[in-house]
Amino acid sequence: MNNEICEITCIHEDKVNRAKSKLANFDTPSVSGFFKILSDENRLKIVHALVHEDELCVCDIANIIDASVATTSHHLNSLKKLGVVDSHKDGKLVYYFIKNIKILNLMELGVNFKEEVLA
């Protein structure tokens, strides 16, 4: 016998309707897209590096994540569209920095979750 699933089908309509009502007001595609972009290891490495270094040029970031400048630029563009990072040009160099420091809270939450729950 599988203890992970119900042995009979029993729908609790009041609970289901409340959950569906709340879900209707929840922007699932945007939140899912946000986590999808952050689910890439290289993007997490980029965010982690920028949290600790304030700003880095694309060449430095490429070296840190051991990727080409083109691949790194693609990752940075995704993070920029998401509003996590921003950039400024200084001569011939483009520097990236964390735009919204709340991303640090999210990363800390992820680390704490892993340590407490997944350990």
UniProtKB/Swiss-Prot annotation:
Q: Which Pfam family is one of this chain's hits?
A: HTH_5
Keyword DNA-binding, does the record have it?
Answer: yes
Query: What ranges are recorded for DNA binding?
Result: 58-77
Q: Domain of life, per the record?
A: Bacteria
Q: Which UniProt keyword terms apply here? A: Cadmium, Cadmium resistance, DNA-binding, Metal-binding, Plasmid, Transcription, Transcription regulation
Which InterPro entries does the UniProt entry name for this protein? Answer: ArsR-like_HTH (IPR011991), ArsR_HTH (IPR018334), HTH_ArsR_DNA-bd_dom (IPR001845), Metal_resp_trans_reg (IPR051011), WH-like_DNA-bd_sf (IPR036388), WH_DNA-bd_sf (IPR036390)
Tell me the Gene Ontology biological-process terms attached to this UniProt entry.
response to cadmium ion
Record flagged with keyword Isomerase: no
Q: What are the GO MF terms of this UniProt record?
A: DNA binding; DNA-binding transcription factor activity; metal ion binding
Kindly list the positions annotated as binding Cd(2+). Answer: C6, C10, C57, C59
Record domain HTH arsR-type: where: 23-118
Task: Read off the PANTHER family from this record.
Answer: ARSENICAL RESISTANCE OPERON REPRESSOR ARSR-RELATED, HTH-TYPE TRANSCRIPTIONAL REPRESSOR CZRA
State the function annotated in the UniProt record: Metal-binding repressor for the cad operon. Involved in resistance to heavy metals, such as cadmium, bismuth, zinc or lead. Metal binding causes the repressor to dissociate from the DNA.
Q: How does it assemble?
A: Homodimer.
Q: What is this protein called?
A: Cadmium resistance transcriptional regulatory protein CadC
Species: Listeria innocua serovar 6a (strain ATCC BAA-680 / CLIP 11262)
